[in-house]
Curated annotation (Swiss-Prot):
Name of the protein: Bifunctional protein FolD
Enzyme Commission designation: 1.5.1.5, 3.5.4.9
Family: Belongs to the tetrahydrofolate dehydrogenase/cyclohydrolase family.
Signal peptide limits: none
NCBIfam families the UniProt entry points to: PRK10792.1 (NF008058), PRK14186.1 (NF010783)
Reactions listed under catalytic activity: (6R)-5,10-methylene-5,6,7,8-tetrahydrofolate + NADP(+) = (6R)-5,10-methenyltetrahydrofolate + NADPH; (6R)-5,10-methenyltetrahydrofolate + H2O = (6R)-10-formyltetrahydrofolate + H(+)
Top-level taxon of origin: Bacteria
Function: Catalyzes the oxidation of 5,10-methylenetetrahydrofolate to 5,10-methenyltetrahydrofolate and then the hydrolysis of 5,10-methenyltetrahydrofolate to 10-formyltetrahydrofolate.
Natural source organism: Bacillus thuringiensis (strain Al Hakam)
GO molecular function, one term: methenyltetrahydrofolate cyclohydrolase activity
GO terms of biological process kind: L-histidine biosynthetic process; methionine biosynthetic process; purine nucleotide biosynthetic process; tetrahydrofolate interconversion
Oligomeric and partner information: Homodimer.
Length: 286
């Protein structure tokens, strides 16, 4: 058995086409979804991510605004800019590109964003709503992962999901989203002693640890859905995931590649959240 490859880039394109249609309808009502992205400093990776977000906005018809600051900006000035954007009716979503310089407290910045414009889903209020199953903006990468699993037409309810990784960005929230879908969820991490025994029980295995090709075929239950969140650059310059793709291919039922797997879904779900925010606000732009 050779695994079916879940092509995240194709799923993302399909969802972006749907979003584009939604944006056209909103514009007919005088509503233009708007996303503001704040970039601090000159980090090449951050700039690359921001460029991808701008391109995504352009693709679906979302108004985007890039606000750039030098690395020397004070926390007070950055907070003031967020306050301004919170009060700007043209802006439905505010995203601060992380990481920030060490002298700025990320927690304070994230918590200053209005929960109604928290399209990253990082605000504690958004997290609390997600944990209790309330309607909220879901964090983009975890939301994208759930959507990719749904593409397999597997009924998630009652399935055993194992998550390797417990970060606040991916690991913890993705487990909660699967719990909200009535799955049974197990977390594995660096202190887990019997990891392979646990992962071999997984109907759905999510790997998000940042260790190149860590997960091999002996971690996988035959026919499992394997979602590889890791993006690692090898010495050769080639990108690879946390899963040894070629090694696992003959055991898994479904698997995401790296690149063109989870990555394209992250920005797509950000666009989705921005459009949803515009619908909720319902502000007609003049």
């Amino acid at each position: 058995m050779v695994a079916v490859i879940i092509k995240g880039n194709e799923v993302a394109e399909k969802k972006r086409a749907q979003l584009k249609e939604e944006v056209v309808k909103l514009k007919e009502q005088g509503i233009v979804p708007g996303l503001a992205v704040i970039l601090v400093g000159e980090d090449p990776a951050s700039r690359s991510y921001v460029k991808g977000k701008e391109k995504g906005c352009e693709q679906v018809g979302i108004y985007s605004e890039l606000i750039e600051f030098p690395e020397t900006i004070t926390e007070e000035r950055l907070l003031a800019e967020i306050d301004r954007l919170n009060g700007d009716d043209r802006i439905n979503g505010i995203l601060v590109q992380l990481p920030l310089p060490k002298h700025i407290e990320e927690k304070a910045i994230i918590e200053r964003i209005s929960p109604e414009k928290d399209v990253d889903g990082f605000h504690p209020i958004s997290v609390g709503r997600m944990m209790t199953g309330q309607d909220t903006f879901l964090p983009c990468t975890p939301h994208g992962i759930v959507e990719l699993v749904k593409e397999t037409n597997l009924d998630i309810s009652g399935k055993h999901v194992v998550v390797i990784g417990r970060s606040n960005i991916v690991g913890k929230p993705v487990g909660q989203l699967f719990l909200n879908e009535n799955a049974t969820v197990t977390y594995c991490h660096s202190k887990t002693q019997n990891m392979k025994e646990l992962t071999k029980l997984a109907d759905i295995l999510i790997v998000a640890v940042g260790r190149p090709k860590m997960v091999t075929a002996d971690y996988i239950k035959e026919g499992a859905v394997v979602i590889d969140v890791g993006v690692n650059r090898l010495e050769t310059g080639k990108l690879c995931g946390d899963v040894d793709f070629d090694n696992v291919l003959d055991v898994a039922g479904y698997i995401t590649p790296v690149p063109k797997g989870v990555g394209p879904m992250t920005i797509t779900m950000l666009l989705h959240n921005t459009v949803e925010s515009a619908k909720r606000a319902g502000v007609v732009c003049k």
